[in-house]
Amino acid sequence: MPQIHPPPAVVGLSESEPLASAIAREAGLGRLPIEERPFDGGEFKLRPLESARGRSLFVVQSLAGTEQAPASARLLRLLFLLQSLRDAGADARVVLLPYFAFARKDRRTQLRDPVTSRHVAELLEAAGASGLIGLDVHNPAAFDNAFRIPTIHLSALPMLVHHYLHHAAADRALTVVSPDVGGIKRAQLFREQLAAQSGGEVGLAFLEKRRAKGIVSGGTLAGEIAGRTALVLDDLCATGTTLIHAAAACREGGATSVQVAVTHTPLVAGVSALIGAESISHITVTDSVGAMLPSALLRAAHSRLSLLPVAPLFGQTLRRMLTAEPVAPLLERWPA
């Protein structure tokens, strides 16, 4: 008798439901419904409402926290769901983390410091994750080393390059700026992809920055900025201080316009600060943290804010995984 393989499906917790639905549509996959039942005292239970036995399941959860659901609570709910799916006999449980909270703490900077990203990796593995797909994690090397299960590290850079080529003034003299030394490699990759696809000359600059107890200092700008458009690129905007500091330095260096492109915006206050900064002409972000930006803020931004969906990137990745196609091309050029 031929073996029957049940179809793969996407699973999403309520706080990530819109993102999970969008990823399922992009991937052409069905959904596995779950029950989320709260109890008094903050306790809850999670269980699949259909058979999970033998199925490959893709579990979507952004770990960007809010006042109502902090990152720690979202992580705990994800862990409980993974254990429930494992107990229900799911064959594979691949976690999709559009935003990986706790990933910034990937090394020790003081005695007895925790390496929190590794602790989270151990929790996910213990709960039954069989694979993980992340997006623009703060330190890709630390991300890879933290896990023993297979991982895929996606990048929003090709999407951002495509957006800039088709929706921004890509014909201007442009310099890609890293707001700190640690982001130079990211800025260099963006510059190379943009130059290759536009056929034009794209400059590279970086800002020397120091951070101590949350205070950003330093401001030496290395690179050609005067008379050019500066595109400040970063993986994450928390408070907005670093990006605003870099934008001001670019203006002082003679940039005619300063644009900002960032993947993750886990705090609404950070986006609000960018919108309120007079030195910044335009801001491009992704929705990796889900629908956290209030409509009032989006209206206040008018045409100064572009919001790029990450569901097509995750959906295309799942399609390629399920058809044994390579994922690497998605990291080099966004499909037209």
Which positions does each model-derived feature cover?
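PRPP-associated nucleotide enzymes
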Residues: 1-336
